[in-house]
Amino acid sequence: MGVLLGIAGLTVPLSVALGSGTAQAASACTAKAGPYQKQAEKFLGRPVDGKQSAADCRAIRSFQTAHAISPNIGYAGPITRNMMDLVGKQRAAGKNPNKAKKCPTNRGRIACVDLSRQLSWVQDGKKLVYGPVPVRTGRNGHETRTGSKKVYWRNINHWSTLYHVRMPYSQFFDGGQAFHAISGNVWSAPGSHGCVNMRTADAKKYWSLLRNGDDTFVYGRKPGT
């Protein structure tokens, strides 16, 4: 069940993809085709002609809204294209996120973090236990540090005295860097201050799966860092 929930969370619901509601109403829809119009049309399952239609714009704008891209006016620019590329890689991970075998499989239970794809999952040996789920890691200048780590401190209701924000379900694995829930969008730019930001349901699941002393392995490089 955990694996299926994690993978399902990578797909934007059809109702969002088609677009309606207050978030969409907040901004106008552009009639101008962007430089990545065809790529956006293909990604969203629209007719690929490179021309902006009202339906194309609604679909692009809905994707932008769901992934915290601003302005969300339906223009297929480079930020939207890059996000579609990232989400495509996340979806492609499917039930085998460790296909490249970059996260160790000889340590028992371990939380893996792929910075390049902005994905995390928990595995036990070669068995996928939960995920993969989308995460938001450290921005340029505050990169999430790579390598082998261990969970060393957990605080379910942590409050950051440095950034003055709530960090629910915090599980620290490297200095001040931790897995924790955020109230915002995990796809939003530019990234965290080094922590692995998660949706609340995913952070809660990690809390139930991991314990002090459990391994964590971080690898890759976040786009834009």
Identify the role of each PLM range.
Residues 1-25:
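Secretory targeting and sorting signals
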Residues 26-87:
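Short acidic, glycine/serine/threonine-rich helix-capping segments at coil-helix boundaries
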Residues 37, 41, 57-60, 81, ...:
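Extracytoplasmic/secreted envelope proteins and their assembly/folding machinery
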Residues 95-108, 142-148, 153-225:
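Exported/periplasmic cell-wall-interacting domains
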Residues 98-141:
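A structural motif detector for short, solvent-exposed N-terminal "entry" segments of globular domains
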